[in-house]
Amino acid sequence: MQEESERRDALTPKRPIKLGLALGGGAARGFAHVGVLQVLEEAGIQPQLVVGTSAGSVVAAFYTSGKNASQLLKLSESMDESALTDWTVPLISRGMMRGDALAKYMTQNLDIKKIEEMKIPLGVVATDLHSGESILFQRGDAATAVRASSAVPAVFQPVQIGGKEYVDGGLVAPVPVRFAKQMGADIVLAVDISAPLEANKADGMLQILLQTFSIMGKSLSDFELKEADLVVKPALSGIGSAAFSERKRSIEAGRVAMTKALPQLKILLQKQFP
């Protein structure tokens, strides 16, 4: 009986492994995701789905819309921080920045505008401001979803979608591993771009807000990362959430971390699923 079962299993066609990429949040440290994607592309490995939170959703949207690693690098190098900031008057608004500039930047540079039309399935994670529940956007305007996923409370104004208000996805899923599984991933490669809390400088209002956000998300992130099949954690110590000037260092850190993890990923991809 056992031999017959084994013979039947051997004859059963095996489907391709569905690799899911979960890109975590971390503001300016998100440039590290570009380095990770460079190494994957050089190795001939393409994820079958990508889910992003906050900064991870920015890179995820560009990548799934069809931009290759070289194009992502070029976009990263040319990105002007001032083009992403639209300051408001904090005392009379619900955030230091509106967030319109980020949405405009995404719209101008995305090859595909709708989430459901992306070349690779895309998921964008945000948080319902009033219920505290998570939302996985798999349809709709990509720029608006990314803006919502990146709306750090008190830094960016909440984003209205379908009559509800949404803020940063990092409140519920700093690294969206479970959402990659929800979308059907057999294997989840998680990229954690958080930095040791003690290594982050908090010497300005924006830095203090982002550091507070990092503290809130640490335990949740640690819990979720346990569900990943492989975690890539670039060495980003000393690179603050607002350190756009460190983009080259962040990209290189992503390359180094993914290169080290590549042999283990290749082993995981040799698994077979019925």
Model-assigned labels for residue ranges:
Residues 1-53, 61-274:
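Patatin-like phospholipase
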